[in-house]
């Protein structure tokens, strides 16, 4: 178990995004931040729809990925349409609830102290994840 170099207690940081895999910018920048947190005594964990991190530090939620069929359907119905149909709003909230429930599981399983969202709030590829 790692201990924080500032307070000598253990802390867990949870990174959240659609994907932490490969060499895209978000994955590379998150790896840098995880290294910084790890060097000061935090332990890093990852929540996403695609992961290439060790399973003991990963929490896979398929609906978090922007390529998930339901997420792609929401995206298609929100962008390029002048009016959003009510079924789309219902679907967004249904998916949001599912992702939120899994997020609580992630927080509890890894005893997360700090959440770091990576592009989940700024880029609307996965609207339910951003909500």
Model-derived features: positions:
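Surface-exposed cleft-lining segments at the edges of enzyme active sites
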Residues: 88-90, 119-122
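Nucleotide-activated donor-dependent transferases that construct or modify glycoconjugates
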Residues: 4-23, 114-121
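Short catalytic/ligand-binding loop motif for oxyanion handling, primarily in non-cytosolic enzymes
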Residues: 23, 53-56, 123-126
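Short, electropositive, low-hydrophobicity segments enriched in small/polar residues
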Residues: 18, 29, 52-53
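Short amphipathic alpha-helix
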Residues: 26-37
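A conserved catalytic-core segment of Leloir-type glycosyltransferases
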Residues: 2, 7-10, 36-114
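Charged helix-capping and loop-helix junction motifs
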Residues: 128-131
């Amino acid at each position: 178990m790692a201990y924080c170099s500032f307070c000598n207690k253990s802390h867990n940081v949870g990174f959240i995004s659609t994907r932490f895999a490969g060499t895209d910018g978000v994955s590379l920048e998150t790896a840098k931040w995880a290294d910084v947190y790890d060097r000061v005594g935090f332990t890093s964990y990852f929540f996403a729809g695609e992961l290439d991190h060790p399973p003991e530090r990963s929490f896979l939620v398929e609906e978090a990925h922007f390529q998930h069929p339901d997420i792609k359907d929401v995206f298609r119905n929100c962008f390029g349409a002048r009016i959003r149909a009510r079924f789309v709003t219902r679907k967004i909230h249904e998916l949001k609830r599912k992702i939120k429930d899994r997020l609580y599981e992630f927080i509890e399983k890894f005893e997360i102290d700090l959440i770091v969202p990576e592009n989940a709030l700024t880029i609307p590829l996965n609207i339910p994840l951003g909500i």
